[in-house]
Amino acid sequence: MFHLTTALDAASGVPLYEQLYESLAAEMRSGAIPAGTRMPGKRRLAAELSVSVNTVDAAYQILATEGYMEPRERSGFYVQEYLALPTRPEEVPPPVSAAPPEAAEPPVRFDLSTRGVDPGLFPFRTWARLQKELLYSSPQLLTHGDAQGDMELRQALADYLEEYRGVRCTAEQVVVGAGMEYLLSLLAPLLPGKTAVENPGYQRAKQVLENNGVACCCLPVDADGLSVEALSGSGAAVCYVTPSHQFPTGVTMPAGRRTELLHWASRCPGQRYIIEDDYDSEFRFDTRPMPSLQGMAGADGPVVYLSTCSRSLAPGIRIAYMVLPRQLLPAWRAKYRIYSGTVSRFEQQTLARFIREGYFTRHLARERVAYKARRDALAASLRAAFAPDELTLTGLHTGLHLLARLKNAPPDAALRAAAKAQGVALSLLSDYDLTGGERDFSGTFVLGYGSLSEASFPEAGETLRKVCTAAREASVTV
C-alpha cells in the first residue's frame, strides 16, 4: 500500500491531479520518497487512492516534465537521484524591532518647486481625438518601431526646431527617447573624455553621466553662463550647458559667450563636444528667444541638442529628443541599432500630428500667456510681502521659476525647516551646489510658479514672509 502524508480532498476546489502532484513533489523534495524509488503503477495507485487513472497519469506527467521522476521503458517511473535534499533544522530569524513611527509631515499648501507644471493646461480634447483617430486608422502602430523613433515624428521635430529654435538638422539626426535621462545614458558612451557641468547646476544630468562611467568636473556659472575660461583650463573634452535658461540661476548665455564656447569646441574637431540642454526655451516671456547653439554651429558642428516635452506638454508623456551631429550617427547606429524604441508609437504619432497640424505652437502660445500671468502674480506677491531692499528678484524673463535673494538671510537649514513647517515646497540655490559648499549660494530661494493658480500667490507670498521670520527666530535661539 502506498501512503500519502496529505490526503486528497475532492471538495477543496483544487483539481485532484494538482493535489496529487503537489503531495508527491513535496515528499520527493523532503526525501520521504527517496531518490531511486520505483513509483507504483498508475492503475495500482489510482485504485489505492480511489481516483481515476487519468488523475494519476496527469500528476505523473507533470512530475516527469519537471524532473522529479524519469520514465524507464517497460519498468515504470523512478524518482530522480538528485532530488533527495538533506534536511536541516529550520532557522528562525531573530525578531526585528519595530521602527519608531515617523512624525507626520505637514501637508504641502504651496508647491513652489521647480518641477511643477499645470496639468490643467494640457490639451486633453485635441490629444484624445488625435489618439482615437490613430487607434482606429493605424493598427500597424502596434508593431515594433525604429530605435531612433518614428520617422514622422522625427521629421516633424526637425521642421519645428528649424523654424522656432534655428536648429539645422535632418530627420536622420533626430533621436527620440523616453526622457532626458535615457537619452543622456545613450549619449554618454559616444563622447570622449571628461565632461564639464555647470555649478550651480542640474544634479540629475551629472548623476546620469557619472552612472554611465563619465568623469565630471563642476565649473562656475557667472552672469553670462558657464565660464569658458574655467572650461579651457579644466581638461574636459565635453561640456553640458543650459544656455537658453541656465538651471537654476535663470541666466541666458549671450551671443558673445556662445561664440567663445563654440570656438573652444572647434579648436579640437571630433575631440570636443557641447551638450546643449535647451531647458525652458519655450517659455521666454518678454523678448524673442535666442537661436540655439546648435543652429550657430550647424549640422556638422560639435553640438548635441537635447530637449523634452515634459514642460511644454506634461512629464507623463515621456517624450524627449536629441539632435546628433552627423559625425556621431555611425557610432550611434553601430551601438544602438538593435535597441527597441522606448516611446509608445501611438504617443509618437500623436505628437507628430500635434506638431504638423499647428496645435503645438498654439498650445505653447496659450501656455506662455498663462505662465507669464503667474510669474507676474508671484513677483507682485513677493514685492508686497517684503521690503524693497530685503528681497532681490532675478531670472524673471524665461522659464517657470525665478530666484529671490534675501538680504541678511538666516541659514539655509533654518529656511528649509521653516518652509517645511509652513507647508511650502521649494528649493534653495544651495540645493543645486554640485561641489558640496566650495561656493556660497546661501540665502536664495528658487521658486517655481508652474503649479499654483494666480489666486494662490498673495497668500503664498505672505507665507514665505512667515518662513523667513520663523527661520530668523530659530537661528537666533540656537
Predicted regions mapped to residue ranges:
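Conserved core of the PLP fold type I
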Residues: Q131, Q140-G270, E282, D286-A299, ...
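Active-site PLP attachment segment
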Residues: R74, M296-A331
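N-terminal basic, amphipathic alpha-helical segments
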Residues: M1-K132, P139-L142, Q327-L328, R333, ...
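Residue-level marker for buried hydrophobic side chains located in beta-strands
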Residues: L112, I274-I275
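Residue-level detector of anion-binding/catalytic polar loops
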Residues: A215, Y273, V424-A425
